[in-house]
Amino acid sequence: MSAPRTCYGIIPARYASSRFPGKPLADILGRPMFWHVYDRARRCAAFDEVALATDDARIADAANVLGVPCVMTAEHHPSGTDRVHEAAMRLGVADDAVVVNIQGDEPALDPRMLDQLVAPFADASVRVATLAMALSAQEAQSPDRVKVVVAANGDALYFSRADIPFVRDGDVGGDTAGRLGHIGLYAFRMEALRRFTQLPPSRLEQTEKLEQLRLLENGIAIRVVPTTYRTHGVDRPEDIDVIINLLRENDG
């Protein structure tokens, strides 16, 4: 009998996108974007299985041609996290197993980030983990960059689009406040992932438009792992050229 699988990487990939329809199929160096994400993810030694989760037959067909494991999910989900949960259910993931939500629009993702993200689960008390990196004072001014404040034990105190922590005294524009920018990669114990999908959207979540606040408001701790690795997502077609340059630099 084979050993039970304990760590899954799931890549949500939906076809519909207001800014970039068909984004998972966008050509990058001769292969669709989702393949590059899968290729990066499978380099993470912690994963027992990596699979695509999609609602679209065109993406599923392309995945099958390229030998990428694929799970078909419902078309309508409130978030990518809900799609990941459905895929994990279909894969029969055990409650104590770890499920990593790997953003499908991060084709230049450094696999070492995934290793860092999964590492805290050696502690059986950890239920959710995410990544953060140092921000300059200038970067922290943008509401598009989500900030996180971390407790002494490494758990998140709060996430915000505002510049936190606020520096009341001293050089407000300086870099001495230890600002951290959130990186939107999450790992969950399966039971915590299920709990997240069962909870209604919370007050702070709706205020900030940040779904991770649903966890904090309901007493579910999020372990924050610092990283120095950078990545670049694809929001619009013009981002593809940036990704191609990054891939050539990293793999050249």
Swiss-Prot record:
EC number: 2.7.7.38
Gene Ontology BP term (one): CMP-keto-3-deoxy-D-manno-octulosonic acid biosynthetic process
Keyword Protein biosynthesis: no
Top-level EC class: transferase
Catalysed reactions, semicolon-separated: 3-deoxy-alpha-D-manno-oct-2-ulosonate + CTP = CMP-3-deoxy-beta-D-manno-octulosonate + diphosphate
Pathway(s) per entry: Nucleotide-sugar biosynthesis; CMP-3-deoxy-D-manno-octulosonate biosynthesis; CMP-3-deoxy-D-manno-octulosonate from 3-deoxy-D-manno-octulosonate and CTP: step 1/1; Bacterial outer membrane biogenesis; lipopolysaccharide biosynthesis
Alphabetic keyword roster: Cytoplasm, Lipopolysaccharide biosynthesis, Nucleotidyltransferase, Transferase
Tree of life domain: Bacteria
Subcellular location: Cytoplasm
InterPro entries: Cytidylyl_trans, KdsB, Nucleotide-diphossugar_trans
Statement: the UniProt record of this protein carries the keyword Cell membrane: no
GO cellular component terms, A-Z: cytosol
NCBIfam families xrefs: kdsB (TIGR00466), PRK05450.1-3 (NF003950), PRK05450.1-5 (NF003952), PRK13368.1 (NF009905)
Protein family (similarity comment): Belongs to the KdsB family.
Protein name: 3-deoxy-manno-octulosonate cytidylyltransferase
Biological source species: Nitratidesulfovibrio vulgaris (strain DP4) (Desulfovibrio vulgaris)
